[in-house]
Regions:
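N-terminal single-pass transmembrane signal-anchor helix
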Residues: 1-20
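Membrane-proximal N-terminal amphipathic helix
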Residues: 21-56
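Terminal alpha-helical segments
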Residues: 25, 37, 51, 80-83, ...
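Charged, amphipathic alpha-helical segments
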Residues: 45, 49-52, 59-62, 129-155
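Type IV pilin-like appendage domain
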Residues: 58-136
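Short, hydrophobic/aromatic-rich segments at coil-to-beta transitions
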Residues: 76, 157-165
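Small-residue (G/S/T/A) turn/hinge positions that recur once per unit in extracellular repeat modules
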Residues: 111-120, 140-155, 178-184
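Low-complexity, S/T/G/P-rich flexible repeat/linker segments used as non-globular hinges
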Residues: 167-190
């Protein structure tokens, strides 16, 4: 009986020790899927919105997107927005003071996870020095439009080939969501 109790105690100790890592990896992967689905929802709103017969401001053609900000004050949330302009020469952005973007919904990241970094990739490689990342979609194109605050001029945004959102957990581990210009999403992690 004493040996059985010792074996059960050892197994219980091992399970409880490994639970934090298991819980962290499951929650990170779940959040990565949630972010990917939020991006897909923004794309669907951009290209599949039904035109209202009475649409004086032409809002049918407004781009929709998601903004990610790894600054400490904002790293526990991300925001869906609508860019209230049909000017195709404007890069849809959120929160730069002059932007006609309207916040639609703010998603709060729970528990122990944060958006720890955002990166963009161009022909020169990956750049993680940007302050904020906006990924949006404009009718009739299905391709992703990127804006990296601190990346360069609005004309430089066309050079961005993909974007990465890095998600970290205080319990250990990280994962990421990558969106490329052809609107392909991929998830990964350590």
């Amino acid at each position: 009986l004493l040996i059985s109790i010792a074996i059960i105690g050892i197994i219980t100790g091992i399970v409880l020790t490994k639970y934090g890592g298991f819980d962290s990896s499951v929650l990170l992967k779940s959040l990565a899927y949630e972010i990917a689905l939020s991006l897909r929802e923004a794309q669907i709103k951009s290209v599949s919105v039904v035109r209202n017969g009475n649409d004086p401001d032409n809002s049918f053609d407004y781009p929709y997107g998601i903004t990610f900000d790894p600054a400490p004050a904002n790293q526990k949330k991300y925001t869906a927005f609508r860019f209230a302009s049909t000017d195709v020469t404007e890069v849809p952005t959120f929160g730069n003071g002059t932007s006609p973007a309207e916040p639609l919904e703010t998603f709060t990241i729970g528990r122990t996870m944060i958006i720890s970094d955002v990166c963009v990739t161009d022909a020169g490689g990956e750049d993680c020095s940007i302050d904020r990342l906006d990924i949006s979609f404009r009718r009739p194109e299905c391709t992703s439009l990127f804006y990296g605050a601190g990346y360069g001029s609005p004309a430089d945004m066309a050079d961005i080939e993909s974007a990465k959102i890095l998600i970290s957990s205080s319990l250990g581990g990280d994962t990421f969501v990558v969106e490329d210009a052809r609107n392909l999403k991929s998830l990964g992690g350590n």
